[in-house]
């Protein structure tokens, strides 16, 4: 017996992988000739992550503590000691990743900055540049350099505590970004130098380097721009380089 998927499509066989929703999505994409513009992560049914999902790597040859319950365990993490004159120090080995003003509201960006301070972590600007309030509220702020370069400002770059050169991310490896016109408000359009009410489409690759050799040159350029003061990270999704 066939399963009804939509008014226009019939699913003849159902499996654990190709559910009615996935089959319908494939059919709609084929009909449109492009991807569907909609929210995925917030709409799909997903199990919330718990501490059970964390895997701690054991140190099997480390000295065994004589009184483990009394000895202090430090989670302090220092990044950038190899090249940067001013490394960053975090109280915990967890960082808040880049989420742009536009994808998130102004209040959400400021709240993330304050929350990062409370737990001793760092905050990241995301696409579209740096908010002044975000800089003021962040003890440790990472400036994200993306392929789009929307809102890029060399002065904001120098005001950051670290730089993140984004090659890709796990949420959308190998693809660019899209900020719908409904979110490109007057203030956001001004900061990103975009026409008001027009979709912002971000490319998947940087315009000024093509491969790993060129990327090294870009990193050196960023080091010179910041006088070798701050750490520089490279962010990429778990993909083939």
Briefly describe each language-model feature range:
Residues 114, 135, 149-241:
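Alpha/beta enzyme core
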Residues 123-126, 143, 165, 234:
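General beta-strand structural signal in soluble alpha/beta enzymes
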